Amino acid sequence: MSGQSLTDRITAAQHSVTGSAVSKTVCKATTHEIMGPKKKHLDYLIQCTNEMNVNIPQLADSLFERTTNSSWVVVFKSLITTHHLMVYGNERFIQYLASRNTLFNLSNFLDKSGLQGYDMSTFIRRYSRYLNEKAVSYRQVAFDFTKVKRGADGVMRTMNTEKLLKTVPIIQNQMDALLDFNVNSNELTNGVINAAFMLLFKDAIRLFAAYNEGIINLLEKYFDMKKNQCKEGLDIYKKFLTRMTRISEFLKVAEQVGIDRGDIPDLSQAPSSLLDALEQHLASLEGKKIKDSTAASRATTLSNAVSSLASTGLSLTKVDEREKQAALEEEQARLKALKEQRLKELAKKPHTSLTTAASPVSTSAGGIMTAPAIDIFSTPSSSNSTSKLPNDLLDLQQPTFHPSVHPMSTASQVASTWGDPFSATVDAVDDAIPSLNPFLTKSSGDVHLSISSDVSTFTTRTPTHEMFVGFTPSPVAQPHPSAGLNVDFESVFGNKSTNVIVDSGGFDELGGLLKPTVASQNQNLPVAKLPPSKLVSDDLDSSLANLVGNLGIGNGTTKNDVNWSQPGEKKLTGGSNWQPKVAPTTAWNAATMAPPVMAYPATTPTGMIGYGIPPQMGSVPVMTQPTLIYSQPVMRPPNPFGPVSGAQIQFM
């Protein structure tokens, strides 16, 4: 069972909802479980510090927030996580910590929840002090002593005297804070403090290696220093001897808790004669009496001390290199294990062969395709056999003759059957379009049908300018004339044809409009009756008659008898014999019109009175209606064949 508390799970869930993966991982790494932070969480946070799009201050603030918890486990694990990121994370993290004024304010931390809380609170206060000192050291020298280059050409070995005397005390302060942790093997009783001790142990080795190289550089330059510098140098060396004793005790504790002996360096102390030589040199600079000593003896003592310190530094370096090598071997072992696991997974999968049998899907598909596919876009081959036109598919027409046409595709024949103008040539289409004008008269016998199978003669001209588009050119019976109005335009215009032969070969130049339809005697289809309320039918005569009757010309009064031979009584609506009447200039004796419904003022502009009305004369008085209630705007009538609807002017 996991040792995570309910509070840890709730906190992690809250960060999951907010979408902060970094904060969630911080909570996972600092749970109430009494064990060190898990490696997967630490590795994730380390990778986050290497990503440029990760907010480092937010990560640090999340860790600082966890240190405010009352549980010693959460606080201790927060410090361990921070220390781990400072050592193995990107340098940006420690740079941010060094730029902060305050870090961990845990000098008064105390967990009173239990006896173990009291004991661990002491180490938490010491541990937080070391981390604060580590950040301060980076702020002062702008680099981490545990990561500097070491060796003969290292940072501490090549540093000048002035900078060296300022840098070594900083290392001493950080070393003091580390050694103040002062833990015994009996106190390393849980996984949390053990994880902290391992980080401190690695820091102690690297920090003491830098410290040792700084002392070697100091001893090499000691006899060439000024009096004040020699005094500072002697004080630094004495402190170094004290720290060496304490670091030896720290390493003994590490050996007791089970750390490998090969990972613990051997510390070789310098001979005691070196300290006497340094003191005598300082006394000589101060003018005091000293024992007689030759330069050769001083050089021998100095060389022995440097060699012993160099061996210590070499041991520390070997430990560090051994640690790096162990880390590399661990990574290689993990990579090898992953490769072996991958190979096992691939070996378990069956090998697929390229020469496999046909799939059942393709086999079934081959069985279904019993008929060859038809390409509707391909050009059909010519055939000598004459196929019957498909116009009698629904038995709509009974052709009386079959025109001699070129063999065409089925789609073209169907289109020609229903009067598709695209199936004809350009000349035929151009010849058919003017016939759609109701003012032009042309005998149906003059139309020559010309059908070509050449696709290149296709024209984009479409009969969109027809007056009544979209009506089905199906044969219908001659509609009965209305009882109110009996108009025969064909007899009036003089171009009525009695013998009209309908071309059933598949082409109708007018689409069934503007021509009377003659039903064949062989047709057995039921006659489609036009509903009485239909305003527009397939025949122009009945359509115009219905429109004129529904418009209610003449104040809505229905005229039962219309005599077209009385031009003086009515106006002609059109035709080839229609002539506009010119009003006489001597007298205004017009026919009596309907009673006026409105009056026009004398200031009405010319041409605004009505359609087809002459302009108002200034000398003719206009009779107005005294009972006028409102003025109605005059609009142009939508029917050009009828009289103007609305108000009329009556002249006296």
Curated annotation (Swiss-Prot):
One of its GO terms (biological process) is protein-containing complex assembly. Cytoplasmic adapter protein that plays a critical role in clathrin-mediated endocytosis which is important in processes such as internalization of cell receptors, synaptic transmission or removal of apoptotic cells. Recruits AP-2 and attaches clathrin triskelions to the cytoplasmic side of plasma membrane leading to clathrin-coated vesicles (CCVs) assembly. Furthermore, regulates clathrin-coated vesicle size and maturation by directly sensing and driving membrane curvature. SUPFAM superfamilies: ENTH/VHS domain, GAT-like domain. Expressed in all tissues examined. Binds to clathrin; involves primarily the C-terminal sequences, but the full-length protein is required for full binding capacity. Binds phosphatidylinositol 4,5- bisphosphate. Interacts with PIMREG; this interaction may change the subcellular location into the nucleus. Interacts with AP2A1 (via its alpha-appendage domain). Interacts (via N-terminus) with VAMP2; VAMP3; VAMP7 and VAMP8 (Via N-terminus). Interacts with LC3/MAP1LC3A. The keyword Repeat does not apply. There is a cross-link at residue 238 (Glycyl lysine isopeptide (Lys-Gly) (interchain with G-Cter in SUMO2)). GO terms for cellular component: cell surface; clathrin coat of coated pit; clathrin-coated endocytic vesicle; clathrin-coated pit; clathrin-coated vesicle; cytosol; early endosome; endosome to plasma membrane transport vesicle. It comes from Homo sapiens. The modification N-acetylserine is found at residue 2. PROSITE patterns: ENTH. Pfam families: ANTH. It is found in: Cell membrane; Membrane, Clathrin-coated pit; Golgi apparatus; Cytoplasmic vesicle, Clathrin-coated vesicle. It is linked to A chromosomal aberration involving PICALM is found in diffuse histiocytic lymphomas. Translocation t(10;11)(p13;q14) with MLLT10. PANTHER family: CLATHRIN ASSEMBLY PROTEIN (PTHR22951), PHOSPHATIDYLINOSITOL-BINDING CLATHRIN ASSEMBLY PROTEIN (PTHR22951:SF16). This is Phosphatidylinositol-binding clathrin assembly protein. Keywords: Acetylation, Cell membrane, Chromosomal rearrangement, Coated pit, Cytoplasmic vesicle, Endocytosis, Golgi apparatus, Isopeptide bond, Membrane, Nucleus, Phosphoprotein, Proto-oncogene, Ubl conjugation. One of its GO terms (molecular function) is tau protein binding. Residues 559-580 are annotated as: Disordered. Belongs to the PICALM/SNAP91 family. The modification Phosphoserine is found at residues 16, 20, 303, 315. Its main location: membrane. Residues 221-294 are annotated as: Interaction with PIMREG. The record marks 648-649 as: Breakpoint for translocation to form CALM/MLLT10 fusion protein.
